[in-house]
Swiss-Prot record:
InterPro entries reported in the protein's UniProt record: Ribosomal_uS19, Ribosomal_uS19_bac-type, Ribosomal_uS19_CS, Ribosomal_uS19_SF
Pfam families: Ribosomal_S19 (PF00203)
Domain of life per record: Bacteria
Keywords: Ribonucleoprotein, Ribosomal protein, RNA-binding, rRNA-binding
A single MF term (Gene Ontology): rRNA binding
Protein name according to UniProt: Small ribosomal subunit protein uS19
Organism: Bacteroides thetaiotaomicron (strain ATCC 29148 / DSM 2079 / JCM 5827 / CCUG 10774 / NCTC 10582 / VPI-5482 / E50)
Gene giving rise to this polypeptide: rpsS
GO BP terms, alphabetized: ribosomal small subunit assembly; translation
């Protein structure tokens, strides 16, 4: 089920404030966040956000194509190691 349109997108307030501050000052610093559910807004474009995947922070450079998606989509939490196969002896 998707989020109600009357509520608007969820963007972490602390993350949004840090991005706005960087846009005003012109600085580009990697921002660490645990807010995987945050929606990427157009203000995030051009910044690098380090998204936590449960183990470590994955740096995500935000482009225009990512606007409207969630930060967690770009930091996978599971690693696929392959299915058991025939071992060569």
């Amino acid at each position: 089920m998707s989020r109600s349109l009357k509520k608007g997108p969820y963007i972490n307030v602390k993350l949004e404030k840090r991005i706005f501050a960087m846009n005003e000052s012109g600085k580009k610093v990697v921002v660490k966040t645990w807010a995987r559910a945050s929606m990427i807004s157009p203000d995030f474009v051009g910044h690098t956000v380090a998204v936590h995947n449960g183990n470590k922070f994955i740096p995500v450079y935000v482009t225009e194509n990512m606007v409207g998606h969630k930060l967690g989509e770009f930091a996978p939490t599971r690693t696929f190691r392959g299915h058991a196969g025939n071992k060569k002896r």
